[in-house]
Every structure is written in C-alpha cells, then in structure tokens.
C-alpha cells in the first residue's frame, strides 16, 4: 500500500439510502456491509475451492474464472439474486436491471496489485469486450475475505468518473494517483462502483488469499 494513500474506513452501515445513492453517484464507490453471513461465506468458499482457475497475463498469483453466472446454485441464490443488493440496485437504477457479467477472482500472496483502470470502455476492448461499452453499469464486488491493508485491499480515485480531462481517458491505466483511497471492508461485504471510476487493488503482501465475486449490472434502457 502507498504510504500516502488515504483510508476510507467509515461506518458504512450508518448511511441512509439517500446517502448511499449519493455516494456512488458522486464519489463513484460505496460499501454495502454484511450482505453475506459467516455460513454463506463458508459455503461459497467450499464451492470456489472446486473451481479450475487460470492466471492473468501479468501474474500467476492472480487467478480468475469467468462466466460463473451459468453455474447456478449458490452463485445465483446468495450472490446474483442477493435480496439486499437487488433492493439497493432497484432504488438506484429502477426496477428493470440486467446482469452483464459474473467473474471469480483470487489474489494470492505475491499478487503485485492491479493498476488504476476503468471497467467502462465506450468502444469495447480486448479485456471487457462489448459489455464495457454500456453507458451505465454498476460493478458489485463481493469479498469472501476481509479487505485488510496487507491483503490486496481495494483502491479507488473518488469522482474520477466525473472528469472531462484528457487524463480521464477510460483506456488509460495509472500506477498511482495522489488522491487515491484505500477501502477496507469485512468479509461478506460488497464494494459497488460506477464502472467509469478509476479503481484497482494494492499488492497482496500478506500470508493469505483474497477471494472476490465480481458482478456487473446495468439498467435495462
């Protein structure tokens, strides 16, 4: 973690619905705590332990599996159709929303971190395909492990999705930013982001892995 990074460790459970909507619309990110309980996390970890994964092109310590939405079962019941998540998304986007993607990712010890980037790329890309060209999307990142400073915590540049500057080109990547924020969270929480906000994660310098289920939803329009 950068020694200059700010840490946003507020009590997210104290936010009202209006404050949550404003947070993701204006700041570009939000934490919804306690969406999964300890037993649900354990059940999901038992499932993910059976999955075959592949390494990213930049690190053997970053593993992933795509298209987990087609597995059904626990992924649908506990994650994709999580009632508290859907309740918030309906308040944010309206009643009709569409699931665009669902991916599993595991950051193992030695993972070098992910540079600051956006998931919203209006002309498509080799990484996100045409899905990233949706005009509006909310990424919902469920964490099955605690986000701590040493095990790949989430990082984000608040309000970067609002910038008109050339440096906010959604195809750019940055190693760091002076206003980036580290966002810790407990296992079972989800970090929600506007898909145009610059975000990433810090290296895993700890002794354990960090598992994540990353979903993308958009309004039906």
What are these regions, as identified by a protein language model?
Residues 111-184:
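Catalytic core of non-heme Fe(II) oxygenases with the double-stranded beta-helix
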Residues 170-221:
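Catalytic core of Fe(II)/2-oxoglutarate
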Residues 106, 145-147, 200, 220:
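Short coil/turn motifs at secondary-structure junctions
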Residues 101-104, 140-142, 213-217:
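A structural signal for short, well-ordered beta-strand segments
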Residues 81, 157, 193:
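A conserved hydrophobic position in a structured secondary element of the catalytic/binding core
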Residues 32, 142, 191-193:
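Short hydrophobic-aromatic micro-motifs
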Residues 107, 157-163, 216-221:
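Short edge-strand/loop segments of extracellular domains
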Residues 1-26, 32-128:
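Non-heme Fe(II)-dependent double-stranded beta-helix
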